[in-house]
Curated annotation (Swiss-Prot):
Pfam families: Ig_2 (PF13895). Residues 1-27 form the signal peptide. Residues 289-381, 389-474 form the Ig-like C2-type domain. Residues 26-82, 96-154, 323-342 are annotated as: Disordered. Residues 28-763 are extracellular. Its main location: membrane. This is V-set and immunoglobulin domain-containing protein 10-like. The chain crosses the membrane at residues 764-784. Glycans are attached at N48, N77, N88, N410, N474, N628, N637. Keywords: Disulfide bond, Glycoprotein, Immunoglobulin domain, Membrane, Repeat, Signal, Transmembrane, Transmembrane helix. InterPro entries: CEA_cell_adhesion, Ig-like_dom, Ig-like_dom_sf, Ig-like_fold, Ig_sub, Ig_sub2.
Length: 868
């Protein structure tokens, strides 16, 4: 029997009993149109049930429709359906009045809201239309024709007799509203029982409720509540596993299977009107599986086509599958039509296209269900590299070792090459003969030298993939050239050009040389080590500074040369005593700057440079050396000529033996001062100050009156101070003996030093003669003046008006104590230089008297003081 045939008798009986039970209440209680009907569904629920015509009074027609058993309600809402029922719920009973304000109500019919319980006769003849949103049941009164038609079963119900003129009050006893789904989806395991309770349990008071259970659009069970209520229908396909509770209205489905999952709906119907609809979302899951990722140790290379990981043990019924990498969830595949991502999922597999090194991670597949979760993981190894090796250099001395390292520093080379697994590092040195090359990322080069410079190759090899990469680093070891750059300039052929030369040889790498200051248009470098530039000779080049700029990795040095014409050329003799008795004489020319060349001559005969023998010229030609000098052979005239493209000049000198050209003896307090001169060209190595005396108090002088050397002075000395005994010094004789090596020269003339206050007879005679001569001259002058005055008396008076006035001459007082001693010399001797003595003495004043006539005619001795 179909569902329509099963529901038809129960529906008719329930509707008839409801009408009979509500008839007395309609006359005593007015219906209310303000109550709401509790219903909801996620699907549309529409079915029409038509019943066959029954004999009814005229104008009385009732039609009812029941839901289609093959359609599942989804989005049912009372606000969307015209002609909805509104209920007024009180503590005792509920009243239902139809709302016929919808446009679907024919205008010839009167809605249930227009019924008046106080005038039953008037209302009994009006049509009564009732439509529910769920069942679309139409009831017309007072006609009792109730056509009932269930769609799908094509069944026409038999007519039922209703009393004509009876007042019908559609009273529906419904329970309190309940939500569509309580507690979220229902999850069960395969093989367990699905229990769907109906909460709250509908009241079993008449009219008896009808409970219909569906899964989707398929009816699973339908029946009334109560122990005496019949069970109308059970789905034949699930009849063996279905249990319908007719007391509480619940449903049980034993031995749950995966296909039992879905949306279950329960509908409570009273008197042909759907009152309650509730949905249950049921999920059926298999127990959580034991998962594993295959392959267990996946390996691939960077740039491979793809890598697939499978989550073994998962099936769709056990739960939702997800993948993660290092704990971060991986996104799902892109929508259809978009470019597929590089990492995507396909069923139970994770596909990694074109793996890269960042894909090296731990991948986890996880299955999650309401009953828990399980997971499995695998470590994916992505081999790559080696990349191009990178060589870094460090030095304990240098700030920028990548450019160069200085000789003697300790250098370390570091090589790194990103690779998985780590690459094996090997070195290839610049020196191919080096056999013991250590393996590893660090290469130590202690105390590097120029031989360590060159190319160093780092070779990185991946031991897993076999790939190899190589990089080369050029190590520069810088060694500064010794000394400093040397600059020179010399004349070209026929003195028409100047050749500038700069040299700084040695060093690693070679220094770069360049001239600065040369005329424009002259190519002046840079060149390594040695630079030679020829410039046409021009007068304006004289005095111009030309600088050579020498650049090296370690330092930058300069040298400057100024080409000049010869000026004030002068020869100077230089005497050196290399060994006792062995003398070397040199002639050095000054005022002969580069680019001048010096040409030497002796006694008018030119000297060839580099001729050998005892006469030798220096490398620059500006010094003439005379080895093993001999007074018999090497004395004479020497000359030099300096010439260049800028001018010429010369000088000559006559070399003589050791001698004194002139000397002086002066008195001082308790000392004798000697000064002397020598001719230019005199060769000597020192002076001996010699003396003898007739006083026996001097221990250094013998009674035989031999000359004794009191002082020995150097060749540059030109004065000497000889201290004398303070008491009774006596008479002294002094002379100067020049020395050349071990050979004595010609001594000077001797001079006598007379100590004490008594004048010698000669001095007294001189003073007397001088005084007489002075008086005679003064008398003659007076006589001459008298004669002139007598001869020219007028002019004398005029002259008297202009008397002669002489300014007084002031002599500054002496700073030291002076002594007066008469000597035979008429004037003092000037002192030029100081004399050094083995016994140091302080500088003293030398005072020599000078005879002068006093106003009275007698001579005075005037002191002449000289500070020594």
């Amino acid at each position: 029997m179909g569902l329509s045939w099963a529901l038809l008798p129960f529906l008719l009986l329930a509707f008839r009993a409801e009408l009979l039970a509500l008839q007395p209440a309609l006359g005593s209680q007015p219906p209310s149109a303000s109550s709401s009907h509790s219903m909801g569904s996620s699907r549309d629920f529409v079915s029409n049930v038509s019943s066959s015509q029954h004999p009814q009074p005229p104008g009385s027609e009732a039609s009812a429709g029941i839901p289609d058993s093959n359609r599942f309600p989804q989005g049912l809402n009372s606000s969307h359906v015209p002609g909805l029922f509104r209920t007024n719920v009180s503590a005792e009973e509920q009243y239902l009045s139809p709302d016929v304000t919808s446009s679907e109500t024919p205008p010839s019919r009167v809605s249930l809201d227009g019924l008046d319980s106080q005038d039953p006769d008037k209302d009994s003849g009006l049509p009564f239309l009732v439509k529910t949103p769920a069942s679309q049941i139409s009831v017309q009164t007072p006609d009792t024709k109730v056509p009932t038609k269930a769609s799908g079963s094509k069944l026409s119900l038999e007519h039922h007799n209703l009393e004509p003129g009876s007042k019908i009050s559609s009273e529906i006893y419904q329970a309190a509203s309940f939500p569509q789904q309580v507690g979220g989806p229902l999850a069960v395991l395969v093989g367990t029982t699905i229990r769907l309770p109906l909460t709250p349990v509908p009241s079993s008071s008449p009219p008896a409720p009808l409970v219909v259970w569906r899964r989707g659009s398929k009816v699973l069970a339908a029946g009334g509540l109560g122990s005496q209520a019949p069970l109308i229908s059970l789905d034949p396909m699930h009849q063996a596993r279905l249990r319908f509770d007719q007391i509480r209205g619940g449903l049980e489905l034993t031995s749950a299977r995966l296909d039992d999952a879905g949306v279950y709906t329960v509908e409570v119907i009273r008197g042909g009107v759907s009152q309650q609809i509730r949905e249950f979302v049921v999920g059926v899951f298999e127990p959580l599986p034991q998962l594993s990722v295959q392959p267990r140790a996946p390996e691939t290379e960077e740039g491979a086509a793809e890598l697939r990981l499978s989550c073994v043990g998962w099936n769709p019924g056990s739960g939702k599958l997800s993948w993660s990498r290092d704990g971060r969830a991986l996104g799902t595949s892109d929508p259809e039509g978009a470019e597929p991502p590089r990492i995507r999922t396909e069923r139970d597999q994770l596909l990694i296209s074109r793996p890269v090194r960042s894909d090296h991670a731990r991948y986890t597949c996880q299955v999650r269900s309401p009953f828990g979760h399980t997971e499995a993981a695998a470590d994916v190894s992505v081999f790559y590299g080696p990349d191009a090796p990178v060589i870094r250099v460090s030095s304990d001395r240098d700030a920028s070792p990548a450019l160069y390292v200085t000789a003697g520093s300790n250098v370390t080379l570091h090589c790194s090459a990103p690779s998985r697994p780590p690459a094996d590092i090997a070195w290839s040195l610049a020196d191919p003969t080096e056999a013991a090359v250590p393996a590893g990322p660090r290469l130590l080069l202690p105390a590097v030298g120029p031989g360590h410079g060159g190319a160093y190759a780092c070779i990185a090899a991946n031991p897993r993939t076999g790939h190899r990469r190589r990089s080369v680093f050029n190590l520069t070891v810088a060694d500064l050239p010794p000394g400093a750059p040397q600059c020179s300039v010399e004349g070209g052929p026929v003195d028409r050009s100047l050749r500038f030369r700069c040299s700084w040889p040695g060093g690693v790498p070679a220094a770069s040389l360049q001239f600065q200051g040369l005329p424009e248009g002259v190519r002046a470098g840079p060149v390594p080590s040695t630079l030679l530039v020829t410039v046409p000779a021009r007068p304006e080049l004289s005095g111009v500074a030309v600088t050579c700029l020498a650049r090296h990795l370690v330092a930058t040095r300069t040298c400057t040369i100024i080409p000049e014409a010869p000026q004030e050329v002068l020869l100077q003799p230089i005497v050196e005593e290399t060994q006792p008795g062995d003398v070397v004489v040199a002639l050095e020319v000054t005022g002969c700057p580069p680019p001048s060349r010096a040409s030497w001559a002796r006694q008018g005969r030119p000297l060839a440079p580099g001729g050998g023998g005892r006469l030798q010229l220096s490398q620059d030609g500006r010094k003439l050396l005379i080895n093993n000098f001999s007074l018999d052979w090497d004395l004479g005239n020497y000359s030099v000529l300096c010439s260049s493209a800028l001018g010429a000049g010369g000088n000559q000198i006559t070399l003589t033996g050791p001698s004194i050209s002139s000397w002086r003896l002066q008195r001082a307090q308790e000392a004798a001062v000697l000064t002397w001169d020598v001719e230019r060209g005199t060769l000597l190595t020192g002076f001996h100050i010699q003396a003898w005396t007739d006083s026996s108090e001097v221990d250094r002088v013998t009674m035989s009156r031999d000359w004794v050397s009191l002082l020995i002075l150097g060749p540059q000395e030109r004065s000497a101070i000889v201290p004398l005994p303070p008491r009774n010094p006596g008479t002294w004789a002094f002379r100067i003996l020049p020395i050349l090596g071990s050979l004595p020269g010609t001594p000077s003339q001797s001079r006598v030093y007379q100590a004490g206050s008594d004048l010698s007879p000669g001095a007294i005679a001189g003073i007397v003669l001088g005084s007489l001569l002075g008086l005679a001259l003064l008398a003659g002058l007076l006589i001459l003046c008298i004669c002139c005055l007598r001869r020219y008396p007028g002019r004398a008076s005029v002259k008297k008006q202009h008397s002669l006035t002489l300014a007084p001459v002031l002599t500054p007082p002496a700073k030291k104590i002076q002594s007066l001693t008469p000597v035979q010399t008429p004037r003092p001797l000037p002192i030029k230089t100081k004399m050094q003595s083995p016994h140091p003495a302080k500088a003293q004043q030398v005072i020599s008297p000078s005879p002068t006539l006093c106003p009275g005619g007698s001579p005075w001795t005037v002191r002449a003081a000289t500070q020594v």
